[in-house]
Amino acid sequence: MTENIRPPLPPFTAETAAQKVRAAENAWNTHDPEKIALAYTVDSQWRNRAQFLAGRDEIVQFLKQKWAKELDYRLIKELWAFHDARIAVRFAYEWHDDSGNWFRSYGNENWEYDQNGLMQRRIASINDSPIAEAERKFHWPPGPRPDDHPGLSEFGF
């Protein structure tokens, strides 16, 4: 089976790296694990916090569990750096648990892509910060962030 091709392809420019970051943000904001997993190689390697994953099946299961726990999830990613087939991003997302406790999670990701533009490695470090519901900043309807919505830098995050 041939893998799909997911432009833009490496080596990245500032413009194509930013496109990759926004595409990933938009996909994660759909909360569709099966669709999201298609952006990764079939044998993609992940470290998310202290959890290690291998392959699309584990990615799908991980994302299903994540969004069963992290409710009303809204994510913003921002390009930090890029070189050849690698991209570094910083991000923040807001969510609440089933008890109504709100959090803003801050983190950094390192991504490595194959020649088809599929992510083959994702390394994520994340910290959760409790917030009051009134402190929330990400209020758009479910789905991708509107183009005119502020990004991380505009919020000072």
Give residue spans per PLM region.
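Short, low-complexity N-terminal intrinsically disordered segments enriched in polar/charged residues
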Residues: 1-42, 153-157
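A beta-strand edge to alpha-helix "cap/lid" segment located at domain peripheries
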Residues: 2-12, 61-157
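A solvent-exposed, acidic/Ser-Thr-rich amphipathic alpha-helical stretch
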Residues: 15-18, 33-87
